[in-house]
Regions:
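A short SAM/SAH-binding and catalytic strip from SAM-dependent methyltransferases
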Residues: 1-9, 32-33
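Conserved beta-strand signature within the Rossmann-like core of class I S-adenosyl-L-methionine
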Residues: 25-32
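SAM/dcSAM-binding transferase cores
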Residues: 65-117
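Short, well-ordered secondary-structure micro-motifs
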Residues: 5-7, 40-41, 67
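A short glycine-rich, Lys/Arg-flanked "PGG" loop and its adjoining helix->strand segment in the class I
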Residues: 10-24
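Conserved Class I S-adenosyl-L-methionine
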Residues: 14-16, 40-61
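Ordered hydrophobic segments in well-structured contexts
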Residues: 27, 55, 66-70
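Conserved PLP phosphate-binding loop immediately N-terminal to the Schiff-base lysine helix
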Residues: 37
């Protein structure tokens, strides 16, 4: 709502229900609003629902935080491959996902040249 209260959309049951509706190789993406209180608890619930296969990207310019969670086989992709795909999308559609790729790279903190979930 206007006061960033998400109610039942931020419960363990909600995240478990989202997971149950994904395919065997599903990816769940959510947006945590910039005034979201209790972000750590929300991420913990999402991580629990997805068997410790969840993460949050560093905040974007608006302050919003994107949460990702996965089911099925591990997600493991080179950051260069993500960047190449983002460049193709920008060229072909105008959709600029390069800032998202940069946030994913920051999430790795230079420890790896791959994104794994």
């Amino acid at each position: 709502d206007a006061k960033c209260r998400v109610g039942t959309l931020d419960t363990l049951a909600f995240y478990c229900n989202c997971r149950a509706r994904l395919t065997g190789q599903g990816l769940f993406v959510t947006n945590f609003l910039n005034r979201h209180r209790g972000l750590a608890a929300s991420l913990k619930r999402m991580d629990e629902a997805f068997d410790a296969r969840a993460c949050a990207l560093p905040a974007c310019e608006s302050g919003n935080i994107i949460g990702l969670a996965a089911t099925g086989a591990p997600v493991d992709i080179a950051l260069d491959e993500l960047k190449s795909g983002a460049l193709r999308l920008k060229r072909d559609t105008g959709l600029n996902l390069l800032p998202m790729v940069a946030r994913i790279a920051r999430l790795q903190r230079g420890l790896s040249d791959r994104f794994a979930l």
